[in-house]
């Protein structure tokens, strides 16, 4: 299935996954870029943005929990974020934190806030749309048919 065909399925869970990957890249790049400023609030929020990129990495690629040596508390916290609604809540919290950069100044961290907000909306729509989370094995490659994701027959790969 091509990328165009995947976007034509109107499966918001896959949209959320793609936007999550883009959000992770943006959070990493903008977190580093905004560390070098003289505003204390911006430095703190850019460090949070940088940390958010690694949290997003573990949320979107759960296989890393088995590969990377992390604490059991961190593993348990990430494993709780398995449903579309929980992912939407996690992305909403990260988006609100980045929207707080407006308290100090308008910086490029707002781009991360916008993408995190869009990701939150996609996961909310996916939760409202139907049964459970449908994921890809890796971007551009199908794990199962899109019909399985929409009908509830799909299982989480780590379940």
Curated annotation (Swiss-Prot):
Transmembrane spans: 18-38, 40-60, 84-101, 105-125
Topology with respect to the bilayer: Multi-pass membrane protein
Glycosylated position list: 11
Location in or out of the cell: Golgi apparatus membrane
Predominant subcellular localization, coarse grouping: Golgi
GO biological process terms held by the UniProt record: vesicle-mediated transport
Xref: InterPro entries: TVP18/Ca-channel_flower (IPR019365)
Function description: Golgi membrane protein involved in vesicular trafficking.
This protein's name: Golgi apparatus membrane protein TVP18
């Amino acid at each position: 299935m091509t990328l165009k065909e995947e976007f034509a399925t109107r499966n918001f869970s896959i949209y959320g996954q793609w936007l999550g990957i883009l959000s992770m890249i943006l959070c990493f790049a903008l977190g580093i870029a905004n560390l070098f400023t003289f505003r204390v609030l911006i430095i703190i929020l850019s460090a949070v943005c940088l940390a958010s990129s690694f949290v997003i990495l573990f949320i979107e690629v759960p296989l890393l929990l088995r590969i990377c040596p992390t604490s059991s508390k961190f593993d348990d916290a990430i494993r709780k974020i398995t449903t579309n609604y929980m992912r939407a809540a996690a992305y909403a919290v990260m988006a609100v934190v980045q929207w707080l950069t407006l308290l100090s100044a308008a910086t490029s961290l707002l781009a991360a806030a916008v993408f995190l907000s869009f990701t939150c909306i996609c996961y909310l729509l996916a939760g409202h749309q139907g049964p459970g989370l449908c994921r890809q094995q890796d971007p551009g490659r199908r794990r199962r048919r899109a019909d399985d994701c929409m009908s509830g027959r799909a299982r989480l790969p780590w379940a």
